[in-house]
Amino acid sequence: MAELYLIRHAQASFGTSDYDRLSPLGCRQAGVLGEYFRDYALHVDAVNSGELERQRKTANIVVGLQPDNVHHEIDPRLNEIEIDKVFEHLVPQLVKTSSNLENFVKEGKHSSKDYQKALEIVFKHWVTSDNDYPNLQSWAEYSGNVHRALAEIVANEGSGKTVGVFTSGGTIATVVAHVLGVTGNQVYNFYEPLMNCSVTRLLYSGEKMSLSSFNDHLFIQSLASKSGEGFLTYR
């Protein structure tokens, strides 16, 4: 039996002009995760990530604390959903029937909580819609790319390996939903609760894959409790 760790990137710079960059707190979160892996002898044989800066930087910080050099493979299929494009295409249509989205558009500057409400509406429509929008990647295409990327990682690494995959919430939710046989609106239920730097553990043998743990962030929560600092973040 082999292990696959799906790791959500550390906190990015939400609300700034460069969201993809890790925040100072995000760098600390990634360091805490790297120390956790090192101190508990959680050695990864290979590392994969998307090409986004927040994913690569989180991987680099964690891998830098591993005892041995670990090869880092970058695959754009592990990138986050292009949610800005999803908003751009769907909000003008959905705002006609959603007061929450109407308020979201009118307010302009948004809190994280406001954004989350809008995200749920837009995400669920995108996942369940049969419509094809020009210049917008469909859910079927996105999820298919994610599944193929993961299948290739598993096939390339073989049995008995521990692989770290540094990616984003949408990607992890897509994988977990697929493993559990969940589709449609329910996919969002695995997207919303994912914490920055959380670890989701999958076990695999050949083509068989099972979920061992989801959204584990106790190592960060423990540090937050001891230090009194707010280490736990969703974005």
Model-flagged regions — what are they?
Residues 36, 61-65, 152, 156, ...:
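Active-site catalytic microenvironments for nucleophilic, acid-base chemistry
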Residues 35-117:
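Phosphate-coordination/substrate-recognition cap region in phosphate-metabolizing enzymes
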Residues 3-5, 10-64, 138-145:
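Loop-to-helix element that buttresses phosphate recognition and phosphoryl-transfer chemistry
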Residues 81-110, 140, 155-162, 177-235:
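Acidic, low-complexity terminal tails and accessory targeting/binding regions
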Residues 4, 161-167:
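Generic beta-sheet signal
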Residues 111-157, 166-167:
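Hydrophobic, aromatic-enriched interface-forming segments
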Residues 10, 169-170, 215-217:
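Active-site metal-binding loops of divalent metal-dependent hydrolases
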Residues 5, 73-75, 212:
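General small-molecule cofactor/ligand-binding pocket signal
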